[in-house]
Every structure is written in structure tokens, then in C-alpha cells.
Design a protein with these regions (language model features):
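Conserved alpha-helix/loop element of class I SAM-dependent methyltransferases that forms part
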Residues: 47-67, 82
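N-terminal, positively charged/glycine-rich alpha-helical extensions of SAM-dependent methyltransferases
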Residues: 14-39
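A short acidic, Gly/Pro-enriched loop at the edge of an enzyme's catalytic core
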Residues: 123-134
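A short SAM/SAH-binding and catalytic strip from SAM-dependent methyltransferases
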Residues: 133-148, 170
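Conserved Class I S-adenosyl-L-methionine
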Residues: 30, 38, 76-78, 201-293
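Conserved catalytic/acceptor-binding region of the Class I
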Residues: 148-149, 155-235, 251
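Class I SAM-dependent methyltransferase SAM/SAH-binding core
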Residues: 68-125, 149
């Protein structure tokens, strides 16, 4: 990968900073997202469910010919890399995430051209009003504790005529591996099954609710919402189980009830029952939302 991933970020007032790997990282007071999750997320979940939708979002952003793009909830950089591949060098890309450990993983992988990585809280973006042409968020809105407030922040930093583009997952029934993982965990922990998947990543799919939150965030134009179906493939039934359980906050839910190994094996068994031992192929579905300021 290109060495262009190393560059200077000037810390904002009221933040702490440290120098590491040629980058000045902005730090908030939030607890760092640590441990093995970022690596597992990148190794298993990115190719399993995120790459196809990252390419889709990047195409939608590029079609608008933006000069400056803000990515929120960048994670380990799958959309960042897709944007870097399709946007001209003159287009500035600022990729942010709440968790520095995820951004460190993104920076370690690198991009094909210059990108600015910066820790930022979507609830209070550290950018001036009207400073970006496009704000893009891949599978992050579901995690915002106050969605209208976060969406209002995206509107604030958008220039007039700019666009917010984000995607969210469809329901569990339309995301077959995730549904199998949920069923496997319910069998393993019948008295108190982990509900993270259906509660958060796969719990924000209703179009009317999404449109209402966008409007509550101050957007006057109606939100355009389209459904995009893709396929999810892995070499073995164990790969989706590892990805969903050990590469997401679901890991903590499982650990609170028993061992991660027990949960992962139960999910693997359920995926095997439904799809065979591997290679496995399942349906995934997302909704893509576009709204202009």
C-alpha cells in the first residue's frame, strides 16, 4: 500500500493527542475499542458483508463529483479504501470513527492515495459548518444513541446542495448468516439469548422510521431509500460465526453468558445445518439512504 496514509492531523482544542506510526491521532475521552475485535472485523466481516456495499456507496459518492468528503463510522476503512480508489486525488477524504483502534487498523492497511484519519464522535462533529460536499456513513447510523441529533450534525457540516448518503442493514430475515448466528446463540443460551444483532445492527430497517429520523435531523428534502440485495460468501461455516461473534460487540454479549468458544461453535453448527460445512453462500440486504441539503 502507498505510504500516503501517513500525514499530519492537527489536534483540535479540547482534545488529547499522541504521535504513533507517523500520524498524530486525536483522542477523545471515550474508552478505546481494543483487543482482537478490529483485526477479526477486518479479516472476517469485511469480505463477508461489507465490501460489496462499500463499493456501492463509493459509486454513489463519486457520481456527485465532490471536492471534500467526510466519512463517519469508517471502522477499519473498507469504504475509505473504496472512496480512495474512485475519487480523484484532488478530492479530500476525511475518514472518522469513534474508536481509535479501528482507525489504527484502517491506517495500517493504508489507502491508494492520501486520506486523513481522525477520531470523531458523530454526536458532536469537530468540523465547521458547511465544510463538506458529501457525508457518507456505512452501517453506522444504527449505533447512534440519538439518531436525529447525529443526523443534524451531518446536515450542519454539509454545504448547501450537498448530500448525506448512508446505508443500514435490512432485517435479520433478509440477512441469512446473521439470522443463523442469532438462532445458534438462542439455542446455546436459551434462558437469556444475546440480542445484540436484532437489537442494533439489524434493528433499524423500517423506511418510515428512517425517513422520520432524517426529517427530525433538519433535512427538508425527502429521503430517497432504495433496497440493495447482495450475496455473502465464505469458505467455511465457521467464518461467519467467527466474524459476527468475535468481530463485533456481540462478543461482549456472549462473554456475559458463557464462553465465546461455546457461542461460536453453536453458531457454526447452525450455519452448517442451514448451508452445509462450506463453502457457504447466503443472502444479505441493506437499505441505502440519500438526502440532499
Amino acid at each position: 500500500m502507498s505510504a500516503t496514509r501517513k500525514h499530519l492531523i492537527v489536534p483540535a482544542r479540547g482534545t488529547r493527542a499522541y504521535w504513533r506510526k507517523g500520524i498524530i491521532w486525536r483522542m477523545a475521552d471515550d474508552k478505546a475499542f481494543t483487543g482482537s475485535i478490529p483485526k477479526v472485523y477486518e479479516t472476517y466481516l469485511v469480505p463477508l458483508i461489507f465490501e460489496a456495499y462499500a463499493a456501492d456507496l463509493a459509486r454513489r459518492v463519486a457520481a456527485r463529483g465532490p471536492q471534500r468528503v467526510l466519512e463517519i463510522a469508517a471502522g477499519t476503512g473498507v469504504v475509505t479504501r473504496a472512496l480512495a480508489a474512485v475519487l480523484p486525488e484532488a478530492t479530500e477524504i476525511v475518514a472518522t470513527d469513534l474508536n481509535p483502534a479501528m482507525l489504527e487498523q484502517a491506517a495500517a492497511i493504508g489507502t491508494s492515495r492520501r486520506v486523513e484519519f481522525q477520531q470523531a464522535d458523530a454526536m458532536q462533529l469537530p468540523f465547521p459548518d458547511q465544510s463538506f460536499d458529501v457525508v457518507v456513513i456505512q452501517f453506522g447510523v444504527m449505533f447512534f444513541p440519538d439518531k436525529p441529533k447525529a443526523l443534524a450534525e451531518t446536515r450542519r457540516v454539509l454545504r448547501s446542495g450537498g448530500a448525506l448518503i448512508f446505508n443500514v442493514w435490512g432485517s435479520l430475515e433478509h440477512n441469512e448468516f446473521a439470522a443463523a448466528v442469532q438462532a445458534g446463540l438462542a439455542a446455546a443460551f436459551p434462558d437469556d439469548p444475546p440480542k445484540f444483532l436484532e437489537r442494533t445492527p439489524y434493528g433499524y430497517f423500517d423506511h418510515a422510521r428512517i425517513a422520520a429520523d432524517v426529517a427530525a435531523g433538519g433535512f427538508v428534502a425527502p429521503a430517497e431509500i432504495v433496497t440493495v440485495d447482495e450475496r455473502s460468501r465464505a469458505q467455511s461455516a465457521g467464518d461467519p460465526a467467527i466474524g459476527y461473534i468475535q468481530g463485533s460487540p456481540l462478543k461482549g454479549d456472549v462473554e456475559a453468558r458463557g464462553s465465546v468458544e461455546t457461542g461460536t461453535q453453536a453458531a457454526t453448527d447452525e450455519i452448517t445445518r442451514r448451508f452445509g460445512p462450506g463453502p457457504v453462500d447466503g443472502r444479505i440486504q441493506a437499505h441505502v439512504v440519500t438526502v440532499e441539503k
